[in-house]
């Protein structure tokens, strides 16, 4: 493990055929850079889940062209960024919400089931942080209401921080995942 901040860039062509080889490549870049004090198996499992979900998201939503992945690390953390261009995540335009009759412009429940509630928390107009809270059997909802945003939940639960930013000037969608060592 190097003591400096390091970065690897990877272009993914958004094809299902390249998902496994792309996942293996990115995990290979991460494997040798996990510091000795970190739980290597835990970090690699979380990275595998997160990267698989980000690659799948690119195939489903990024459209033509390619998606850029940046992997950055230092002695304290690992950052995985996925950047594509196009329309913003639909949540950017759904900020207004009412909770218990009171307007809550910064936090919105976007999905829930008996295990988890998933929230979008607006840091500003185009920047969303995701958070989840564990549910209980008392919170059980009918099957029709079970997680619509399961991929976002998977990444949120597997990371220490998960954010989304839409850059209007470049029409870029940036999904940023942080894992602490």
Locate the predicted segments by residue.
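Bergerat-fold GHKL ATPase/HATPase_c domain
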Residues: 1-49, 60-61, 67-83
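Conserved polar catalytic motif of the HATPase_c/GHKL fold
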Residues: 52-57
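Conserved beta-strand-loop-beta-strand hairpin that lines the nucleotide-binding pocket
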Residues: 2-6, 59-181
């Amino acid at each position: 493990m190097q003591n400096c901040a390091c970065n690897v860039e990877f272009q993914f062509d958004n094809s299902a055929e390249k998902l496994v080889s792309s996942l293996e490549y990115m995990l290979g870049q991460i494997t040798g850079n996990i510091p000795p004090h970190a739980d290597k198996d835990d970090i690699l499992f979380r990275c595998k889940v997160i990267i698989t979900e980000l690659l799948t998201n690119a195939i489903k939503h990024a459209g033509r062209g390619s998606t850029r992945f940046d992997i950055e690390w230092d002695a304290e953390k690992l950052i995985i960024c996925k950047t594509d261009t196009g329309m913003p995540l639909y949540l950017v335009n759904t900020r207004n919400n009412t909770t218990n009759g009171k307007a809550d412009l910064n936090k919105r429940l976007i999905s829930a089931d008996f295990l988890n509630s998933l929230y979008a928390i607006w840091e500003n107009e185009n920047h969303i942080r995701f958070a989840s809270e564990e549910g209980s059997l008392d919170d059980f909802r009918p099957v029709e209401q079970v997680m619509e945003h399961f991929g976002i939940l998977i990444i949120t639960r597997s990371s220490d921080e998960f954010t989304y930013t839409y850059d209007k000037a470049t029409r870029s969608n940036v999904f940023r995942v942080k894992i602490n060592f």
